[in-house]
Curated annotation (Swiss-Prot):
Source organism (scientific name): Guizotia abyssinica (Niger)
GO terms, molecular function: structural constituent of ribosome
Highest classification ranks of the organism: Eukaryota, Viridiplantae, Streptophyta, Embryophyta, Tracheophyta
One of the Pfam families matching this protein, by short name: Ribosomal_L33
InterPro entries in UniProt: Ribosomal_bL33, Ribosomal_bL33_CS, Ribosomal_bL33_sf, Ribosomal_zn-bd
Name of the protein this chain belongs to: Large ribosomal subunit protein bL33c
Length: 66
């Protein structure tokens, strides 16, 4: 009964500041969030302002491929 592919797909968001800085020496990882996006409303890559526990501030988290 479903037509085509699902409209809402799960996406991974990764902290761009941690990736750009090569992960600060005192931090232990890279912040990642899982969320959903509607493929029809947002066909391009998703970017959201989220809190990064490794940078200790709100940074831009961009969509990455699985």
């Amino acid at each position: 009964m479903a037509k085509g592919k699902d409209v809402r797909i799960p996406v991974l968001l990764e902290c761009t500041a941690c990736v750009r800085n090569g992960v600060n020496k005192e931090s232990t990882g890279i912040s990642r969030y899982i969320t959903q996006k509607n493929r029809h409303n947002t066909p391009n890559r998703l970017e959201l302002l989220k809190f990064c526990p490794y940078c200790y501030k709100h940074t831009i988290h961009g969509e990455i491929k699985k």
